[in-house]
């Protein structure tokens, strides 16, 4: 029987949803990940979610490891078959979340393509109003990643949930208690936004954290600016970027966060390819040190 997990924050990683999910989890489980976030790109309609959940939970049985969330990343706010499939994927994941032992479904909020962010708010409300109710009826929460996917305030293809101003507008359009954020510092840092003040302000709405950091090359910015020929920001695995995750986890704890920090790999410019899992396990151990190992108080 697995030892009871005492801490309120787990450290895990993202896993692609599909035919290789179960075997991938089986192989990396010994590294010490405490949670897994199963993610789909655009659609999950080709996956038997019930069977996947059964197979995953069989692998995790007795380990104490959990599925933190199930996710689908696409643009549900547009017309066309791809957007329709993405909306249907949200529905199916909401319905199947409990089979995985989670109450959290995450992804992109979507966007009306190449229109300013405010133009998406009516469509966002129309799409996610029913989805939020469907989720609430099943005890499920929804969370949107704060990823701009190359978009700006004026134009973009994927996601409106980019910055605190966007989150305020989304909340005003659809003030549902079961809608929150899938937050990470990286997506703010690459826009030169300090992530810590927003973390303190929004921690109560953060349902899930992606473990991803950034390195900002200030020497490049000073010499070339942010529109010059040199790249000045890089997505990094935690432990290799600029953030102090001891501070981040302290603020999460102080704000009452109970949930998972799951490493979002496959972005680091150094620890990639053959070094992907080397970097992820280094990030896992770093985040565990920042969290500190739970030690029960003496009972006297």
Language model regions located:
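Acidic/histidine-rich catalytic cores of soluble enzymes
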Residues: 7, 26, 35-36, 70, ...
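Catalytic-face loop-and-helix region of soluble metabolic enzyme cores
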Residues: 214, 253-254
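Active-site clefts of carbohydrate-active enzymes
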Residues: 216, 227-236, 258-273
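Short, flexible/disordered intra-domain loops and linkers
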Residues: 46, 152-161, 270-278
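Active-site beta-loop-alpha junctions enriched in small/polar residues
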Residues: 14-18, 39-43, 70-75, 110-112, ...
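N-terminal pre-domain/capping segments
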Residues: 1-104, 118-129, 136, 176, ...
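Active-site groove signature of glycoside hydrolases
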Residues: 99-118, 141-153
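A short helix->loop->beta-strand "cap" motif at the edges of active sites that frequently abuts
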Residues: 65, 102-103, 140, 255-259
């Amino acid at each position: 029987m697995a030892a009871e997990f005492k801490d309120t924050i787990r450290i895990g990683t993202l896993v692609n949803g599909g035919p290789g999910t179960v075997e991938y989890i089986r192989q990396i489980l010994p590294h010490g990940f405490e949670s897994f976030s199963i993610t789909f790109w655009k659609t999950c309609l080709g996956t038997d979610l019930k069977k996947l959940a059964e197979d995953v939970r069989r692998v995790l049985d007795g380990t104490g490891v959990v599925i933190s969330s199930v996710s689908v990343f696409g643009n549900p706010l547009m017309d066309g078959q791809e957007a329709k499939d993405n909306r249907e994927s949200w529905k199916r994941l909401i319905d199947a979340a409990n089979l995985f032992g989670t109450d959290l479904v995450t992804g992109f909020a979507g966007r009306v393509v190449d229109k300013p962010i405010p133009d998406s708010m009516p469509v966002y409300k129309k799409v996610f109003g029913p989805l939020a109710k469907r989720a609430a009826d099943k005890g499920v929460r929804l969370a949107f990643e704060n990823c701009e996917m190359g978009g700006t305030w004026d134009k973009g293809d994927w996601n409106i949930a980019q910055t605190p101003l966007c989150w305020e507008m989304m909340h005003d359009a659809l003030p549902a208690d079961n809608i929150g954020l899938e937050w990470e510092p990286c997506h703010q840092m690459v826009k030169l936004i300090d992530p810590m003040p927003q973390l303190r302000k929004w921690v109560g709405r953060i349902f899930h954290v992606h473990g991803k950091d950034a390195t900002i090359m200030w020497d490049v910015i000073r010499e070339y600016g942010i529109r010059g020929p040199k790249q000045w920001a890089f997505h990094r695995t935690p432990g290799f970027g600029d953030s102090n995750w001891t501070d981040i986890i302290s603020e999460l704890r102080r704000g009452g966060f109970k949930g998972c920090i799951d490493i979002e790999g496959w972005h680091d410019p150094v620890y990639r390819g053959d070094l992907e899992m080397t970097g992820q396990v280094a990030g896992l151990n770093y985040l565990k040190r920042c969290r500190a190992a739970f030690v029960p108080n003496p009972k006297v």
